[in-house]
Structures are given as C-alpha cells and as structure tokens.
C-alpha cells in the first residue's frame, strides 16, 4: 500500500471526531491532502444536478460559495456518471473546474486530477476531488486504495446527510413528513450571524406562526421568506408575493382581497386577491411598512379571524394563509410615531427574524462573490471566471451599504468589464474592475455622513437620511421628473410622492405637472 495503517487511522479518527460536520470534513480534507500529497482537495455534496462544496483545502476561499452545475463542468459530470475512480490524463481536453483557483498557481492549469464518486447504496451523494500540479502526482496510489478512501468518506457523508434530514423532520409536524418537499432555498453564508439566522429559520419554519423579517435593503429578506415557506408544512402549496411599496393606494385593497364585477370603474369581472391565491399556502408581504393605516386595519382582521371580503362584496370568504412580512424600517419606531398599528405589529412579530447586513458578515463576502462568479460564468458561456487575490481583498475591505444586492451587481459589472478587455473565454477579475462610489473602504458612506450631526442619531433618522439622499440624487439625475425617478427607484410614483412628502422633499401633494 502507498499509505500506512497509521495514515488510515488518521483518516478514520477525523471521520469519527466529536465535532460538527463542517469542522470534521475540513479536518478530513486537510488530512487527505497531506497523506496523498495533492495540491488541492475538495469534498462536494451532490444535489439537483450540481455539486456543492462542503470542505476545501488548497483552493481559493470563494470556491466554497460556487455551485458547480454538471452541464458546465465536463470533468465533474464525468465523475458523477462514473461508478468508480476517475483518473484524468494530464493532456485531457476536459477543463478542470479548479483551474486558476489554486492560490499561488492562478496562471497555471491543474495537471493531475482524480475524482472519487461517493455513493450511498446506488445513489450518488457526493464526490471527492484530488488535484495536483504534477502530472504523475497520484500514480503511486492504486485504484483499490482510492476506493477505500472513497468508501470511508461516503459513509461519513451519508451519516451527516441522514442526521440533517432527521433533524429537519423532527421539527416538522408528523403529518408533514409524509409529503415530498421541494428543494430548499439555499442561503449562502457560514458566518456566525448567518448560521444563527439559519437555525432560527429552521425553528420558525416548522410552526405556523406569522413572521416579521427585518433587514436593510438588499440583505435577502425575500430569500429568507422562501426558506421559511419551503421548510414548512405548507411547502407543497403556493408562496404568493406582493410588494407593498409598489402598490398604488387606489388598487391596494383589490390586490390584497380581490373584487367583484362592477365594484369600481374597470372591474369588468370577478378577481381573486393575493389572499385567495395563497389559500393553504403562504403570502409574503414585502415592505409592509408602506401600507396605509386603513389597509393595516383590514389586514389585522384577516390575521385575527381568517376571513376576507372582496371589494364590492358583502360576503366573507374563509382563507387559511400564513403571512410572512418584510420591512427595512424600524416598525417599533413607526408604531411610536403613529404610522404603524401596534396590534398588527404584535401579530406579526411573535417570532421576528433579523437579516444581518453584509458588513456584519464579512467572512461571507468571498463566498457570495464565488457564487455570483459561477452564475455569471454560466449565463455568459465562459469557461472560467476567476477572482484575483487582490480583487478578493478589495471586496472584503468594502463596507457594502447596498448589501448582497450591491455585491451581486458589482460582480456582474466586473465580469462584463473584464470580458471586454480580455481575450478568450476565461476572465480574471482584478481590483480595477470594481468601482465603488466612495474611495475610502470600510468607512461611513457619503449618505451616512450626510445624516444629522448628533451623537444620539437613531436608526429611524439614519434611514430617513439615507432615503432622502437617495431620492434627491435620483431626482437630480432625472432632471426633476418624478415619474422617471420612481422608475429608477423601482417605486410606484404615488408611493414615491407620499414618501417624499414625509421626508420633507415636497411641500404639498403632487399636482399634474409635466414632470410627472
């Protein structure tokens, strides 16, 4: 044998360590890299025609955030289809998914590559990949030895997946376990705040409580709502979405509750509202803080009694709907200031979820960047999208006032810029491809600096200052045209006028001017 009994014992000990699965697999991958003398190794979980990295060693950190779709990675597809050890020759025409992703060797191609598919019975559950810069790196190891390693790792991975499934079933009502659940919405992040959020999602998802999801714009509140729905007994039923900020007051009640024919001008037929569409499922009300007090009262009645009335109809309809609401406002302060009903707030916030801003989960920036790089690679038909080390450092130094959405847009823009200046189907993202609004990273943004100069500024004042600055800039960029400004900010123009008036940007309700 090319490795000793002691080395096998090290592998077995790593697999049986009394630590969490993530740490156990990381230790295992490090041990395998040392024993086999490879330059990089990775443990991947197989799901939905893609491989998801669980642990890596010797690879760039952003690999943990990448999702390797089989159709875009021929070598991984070959490993998935094989029932045994796969050795790729040094002159293989198939591109290696890790080319350019080994620190210190970004400009070199991986030469030696071995793939070990991992099975539970006849079911593919993952893969172990071993890469080396030397063409003969793994020649001294027989297929039998590699199969032994694969069997040990597959057993540990299968146990971890079974435990995770049992834990998920344990928090669901017994009757829900019998139904096939859709694929869970993945939330990228391994930082402490995100691991805590994922735990809270698992806990509240299994209940039927209404949930208030709070967080800054761009943090991923809709993603959290999807995860709650998909982890609930209602997962097989509809998840209906409604953006309250884009809802004109004149049609808001009809959108929520529906209307009957003739209820108002233009009501030419009966129409179901969002509550009816979500019956037996979940209704996600985004930006709920934008609802008028009158609509808040009607929403409260639905939550209290479970019935609705279509506009123009005297009859009540029973609905069974779980409500998930999201806001970027401090609703407690809104209650104090009389803009949000206290009773509705308490109905919604029995189990609140708070989505942390990206600046509070700094270690997730590179993972998310890797995820978006891989998305761009697939969409644009590129062989590789590589994040240079200097670019990774720059991303980690930025404060991300726009959160995950800003990072996503920054990656997409950088890929387009890099592709325009680099030949071939491989792009390398460098610091110059990322252009941020403020030169000094990790410092208060211009918007924050424009806030009232007082040491006692609260979240409400900071939010108002940010919104006031954003609207002012957009209005200036659109030459004072309110309709164009509303489109740029993705808001309903009537809601924008109301918000601008509240923020002191307008002295009176809008008239019918040429500016819209």
Curated annotation (Swiss-Prot):
Sigma-54 factor interaction domain location: 187-416
InterPro entries: AAA+_ATPase, GAF, GAF-like_dom_sf, Homeodomain-like_sf, NorR, P-loop_NTPase, Sigma_54_int, Sigma_54_int_dom_ATP-bd_1
Keyword entries, A-Z: ATP-binding, DNA-binding, Nucleotide-binding, Phosphoprotein, Transcription, Transcription regulation
SMART domains in the record: AAA (SM00382), GAF (SM00065)
The keyword Transcription regulation is assigned to this record: yes
Annotated binding of ATP, by residue: 215-222, 278-287
Function in brief: Required for the expression of anaerobic nitric oxide (NO) reductase, acts as a transcriptional activator for at least the norVW operon. Activation also requires sigma-54.
Sites bearing 4-aspartylphosphate, chain numbering: 57
Protein known as: Anaerobic nitric oxide reductase transcription regulator NorR
Pathway(s) this gene product operates in, as recorded in its UniProt entry: Nitrogen metabolism; nitric oxide reduction
Domain of life of the source: Bacteria
Annotated DNA-binding residue span(s): 482-501
Native organism taxonomy: Bacteria, Pseudomonadati, Pseudomonadota, Gammaproteobacteria, Enterobacterales
NCBIfam families named among the record's database cross-references: PRK05022.1 (NF003451)
One GO-annotated biological process of the protein: phosphorelay signal transduction system
Pfam families tied to this protein: GAF, Sigma54_activat
CDD domains in UniProt: AAA (cd00009)
Any one GO molecular function term: DNA-binding transcription factor activity
PANTHER family: ANAEROBIC NITRIC OXIDE REDUCTASE TRANSCRIPTION REGULATOR NORR, TRANSCRIPTIONAL REGULATORY PROTEIN
Alphabetical list of HAMAP family matching this protein: NorR (MF_01314)
């Amino acid at each position: 044998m090319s490795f000793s009994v002691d080395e096998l014992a090290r592998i077995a000990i790593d697999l049986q360590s009394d630590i969490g699965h993530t740490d156990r697999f990381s230790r295992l991958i490090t041990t395998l890299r040392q024993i086999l003398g490879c330059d990089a190794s990775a443990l991947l979980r197989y799901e939905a025609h893609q491989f998801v990295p669980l642990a890596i060693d010797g690879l760039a950190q952003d690999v943990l955030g990448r999702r390797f779709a089989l159709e875009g990675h021929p070598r991984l597809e070959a490993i998935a289809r094989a029932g045994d050890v796969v050795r790729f020759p040094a002159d293989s025409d198939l591109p290696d998914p890790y080319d350019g992703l080994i620190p210190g060797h970004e400009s070199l191609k991986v030469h030696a590559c071995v793939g070990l598919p991992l099975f539970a019975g006849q079911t593919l559950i993952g893969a172990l990949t071993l890469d080396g810069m030397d063409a003969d790196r793994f020649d001294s190891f027989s297929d039998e030895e590699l199969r032994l390693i694969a069997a040990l790792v597959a057993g540990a991975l299968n146990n971890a997946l079974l435990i995770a499934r049992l834990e998920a079933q344990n928090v669901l009502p017994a009757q829900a376990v019998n139904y096939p659940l859709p694929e869970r919405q993945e939330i990228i992040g391994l930082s402490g705040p995100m691991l805590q959020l994922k735990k809270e999602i698992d806990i509240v998802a299994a209940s039927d409580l209404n949930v208030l999801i709070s967080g800054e714009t761009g943090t991923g509140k809709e993603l959290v709502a999807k995860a709650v729905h998909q982890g609930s007994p209602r997962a097989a039923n509809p998840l209906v979405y409604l953006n309250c900020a884009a809802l004109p007051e004149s049609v808001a009640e009809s959108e929520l509750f529906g209307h009957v024919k003739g209820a108002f001008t233009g009501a030419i037929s009966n129409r179901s509202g969002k509550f009816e569409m979500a019956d037996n499922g979940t209704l996600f009300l985004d930006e709920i803080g934008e609802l008028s007090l009158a609509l808040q009262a009607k929403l409260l009645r639905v939550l209290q009694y479970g019935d609705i009335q279509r506009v123009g109809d005297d009859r009540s309809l029973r609905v069974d709907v779980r409500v998930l609401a999201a806001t970027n406002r401090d609703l407690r302060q809104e209650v104090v200031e009389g803009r949000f009903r206290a009773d509705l707030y308490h109905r919604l916030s029995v189990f609140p979820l708070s989505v942390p801003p990206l600046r509070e989960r700094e270690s997730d920036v590179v993972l998310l960047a890797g995820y978006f790089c891989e998305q761009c690679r697939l969409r644009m038909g590129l062989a590789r999208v590589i994040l240079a080390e200097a670019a990774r450092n720059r991303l980690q130094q930025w404060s991300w006032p726009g959160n995950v959405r800003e990072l996503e847009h920054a990656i997409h823009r950088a890929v387009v810029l890099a592709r325009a200046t680099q030949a071939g189907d491989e792009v390398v993202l460098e610091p110059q491809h990322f252009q941020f609004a403020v030169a000094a990273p990790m410092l208060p943004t211009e918007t924050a600096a424009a806030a009232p100069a007082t040491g006692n500024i609260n979240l409400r004042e900071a939010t108002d200052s940010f919104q006031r600055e954003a609207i002012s800039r957009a209005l200036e960029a659109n030459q004072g045209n309110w309709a164009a400004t509303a489109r740029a900010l993705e808001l309903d123009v009537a809601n924008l006028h109301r918000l601008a008036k509240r923020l002191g940007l307008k002295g009176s309700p809008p008239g019918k001017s040429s500016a819209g």
